[in-house]
């Protein structure tokens, strides 16, 4: 279906708006993936807070101009599926990585995080970022361990002082 100028402008405006508020972006090639599988991917994306869209390369290039995802322009070759993570940075990368395992025809091209281009080979860097809740849990466990360690050292120091007083 041919798009008229207003449709193209609307697509560019929509994708540009999403890109400005996104935390990260992942670009993939979905050639050879069935419609049913793509529908499953889109549904999983909605549940994970990931905006997924198939966009013409010329339109996506215009949409990312002036955003942190301008570095992805070289990845916009061939059929392009782009996903923007809106809730946590690793969501789209994690979603695409899991989908690619089950669908060999699905190829991740690249990703971007905070204006840095991440090639497909290094997508694990982004996919393994903890969610907000996981990061808080790790921080709390580290703080809890530090407090427990301090308590143990303090009790050991008190015991040594008591032993020294008894000897003297």
Swiss-Prot record:
<dbReference type="InterPro" id="IPR022973">
    <property type="entry name" value="Ribosomal_uL10_bac"/>
</dbReference>
<dbReference type="GO" id="GO:0015934">
    <property type="term" value="C:large ribosomal subunit"/>
</dbReference>
<dbReference type="InterPro" id="IPR043141">
    <property type="entry name" value="Ribosomal_uL10-like_sf"/>
</dbReference>
<comment type="subunit">
    <text>Part of the ribosomal stalk of the 50S ribosomal subunit. The N-terminus interacts with L11 and the large rRNA to form the base of the stalk. The C-terminus forms an elongated spine to which L12 dimers bind in a sequential fashion forming a multimeric L10(L12)X complex.</text>
</comment>
<comment type="similarity">
    <text>Belongs to the universal ribosomal protein uL10 family.</text>
</comment>
<comment type="function">
    <text>Forms part of the ribosomal stalk, playing a central role in the interaction of the ribosome with GTP-bound translation factors.</text>
</comment>
<dbReference type="InterPro" id="IPR047865">
    <property type="entry name" value="Ribosomal_uL10_bac_type"/>
</dbReference>
<keyword id="KW-0689">Ribosomal protein</keyword>
<dbReference type="GO" id="GO:0003735">
    <property type="term" value="F:structural constituent of ribosome"/>
</dbReference>
<dbReference type="GO" id="GO:0070180">
    <property type="term" value="F:large ribosomal subunit rRNA binding"/>
</dbReference>
<keyword id="KW-0699">rRNA-binding</keyword>
<dbReference type="InterPro" id="IPR002363">
    <property type="entry name" value="Ribosomal_uL10_CS_bac"/>
</dbReference>
<keyword id="KW-0694">RNA-binding</keyword>
<dbReference type="Pfam" id="PF00466">
    <property type="entry name" value="Ribosomal_L10"/>
</dbReference>
<dbReference type="GO" id="GO:0006412">
    <property type="term" value="P:translation"/>
</dbReference>
<dbReference type="InterPro" id="IPR001790">
    <property type="entry name" value="Ribosomal_uL10"/>
</dbReference>
<protein>
    <recommendedName>
        <fullName>Large ribosomal subunit protein uL10</fullName>
    </recommendedName>
</protein>
<keyword id="KW-0687">Ribonucleoprotein</keyword>
């Amino acid at each position: 279906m041919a798009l008229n100028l207003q449709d193209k402008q609307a697509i560019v405006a929509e994708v540009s708006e999403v890109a400005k508020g996104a935390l990260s972006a992942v670009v993939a090639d979905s050639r050879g993936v069935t419609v049913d599988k793509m529908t499953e991917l889109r549904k999983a994306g909605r549940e994970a807070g990931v905006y997924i869209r198939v966009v013409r390369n010329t339109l996506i290039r215009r949409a990312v101009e002036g955003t942190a995802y301008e570095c992805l322009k070289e990845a916009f070759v061939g059929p392009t599926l782009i996903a923007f993570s809106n809730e946590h940075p690793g969501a789209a990368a994690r979603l695409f990585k899991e989908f690619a395992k089950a669908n060999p025809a699905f190829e991740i091209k690249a990703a971007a995080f905070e204006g840095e281009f991440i090639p497909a080979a290094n997508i694990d860097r982004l996919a393994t970022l903890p969610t907000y809740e996981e990061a808080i849990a790790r921080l709390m466990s580290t703080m809890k361990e530090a407090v427990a360690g301090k308590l143990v050292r303090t009790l050991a120091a008190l015991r040594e002082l008591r032993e020294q007083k008894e000897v003297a």
